[in-house]
Design a protein with these regions (language model features):
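Hydrophobic alpha-helical and helix-loop surface patches within well-folded domains
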Residues: 1-170
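Beta-strand-rich binding/interaction modules
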Residues: 134-135, 148-204
Length: 204
């Protein structure tokens, strides 16, 4: 609730449709505090547990993060607005990097202080600071619904000494996103950062 001094009071959502602009930050602030106080591993664990609030209700998969048609404002509260929203902020932070992410939040707050804000303005602030086009991210995560359902297979060519990792998306609407793959060689992990395109199978 302390985070609402900034995301909710200093800048408040311009409509119930954009409620996640307030509540996802309150949710994600718990991660930031746990990371600061107890370290990244514990914070990652708490984020994983928080995501269960989204996955617990099967109907959440069909709900957009920003919803412009709803019966009651109470419909906007729940696992999508809070838990999924917080996880999406974490993805955005990892994609942009800490410097750009937090500088973008500062710009958003200063630009809209004592007024209202919406996801569109958050995107513009983050784009301004990072220099990256985030339309694809917001269209997919803020204006869309669902989540990737991933599985993977591996194959090894002994002649070429080449490992292929195939990432399979099991849902009907495909996502694009960066992904880190750890490959172990002689007991030591080698991290490969790849880009998963919006299609059923990606080979790396």
């Amino acid at each position: 609730e302390l985070f609402h001094h900034w995301f909710g009071d200093l800048v408040t959502t311009e409509s119930w449709s954009n409620l996640t602009v307030n509540e996802s930050f309150a949710n994600y602030s718990e991660y930031l505090w746990n990371e600061h106080k107890y370290g990244k591993d514990f914070a990652d664990y708490t984020l994983m547990k928080a995501r269960e609030g989204y996955f617990h209700d099967p109907s959440n998969v069909s709900k957009d993060l920003l919803r412009f048609n709803y019966h009651s404002r109470e419909d906007m509260f729940g696992g999508v607005t809070y838990n999924k929203g917080g996880s999406i902020l974490h993805m955005l932070r990892n994609y942009l990097g800490d410097d750009a992410f937090f500088a973008g939040l500062t710009d958003y707050l200063k630009t809209n202080e004592y007024g209202t804000g919406e996801a569109q303005q958050l995107r513009l602030a983050l784009e301004k600071v990072s220099g990256k086009d985030l339309n694809w991210f917001f269209n997919q995560w803020y204006y869309g619904s669902g989540n990737p359902k991933l599985s993977y297979t591996t194959s090894f060519d002994p002649v070429k000494k080449e490992l292929t990792v195939s990432i399979n998306q099991g849902q009907t609407e495909y996502f694009q996103f960066p992904l880190a793959i750890d490959v172990f060689e002689n007991g030591k992990p080698i991290r490969k950062k790849v880009w998963v395109n919006a299609k059923a199978i990606n080979d790396f």
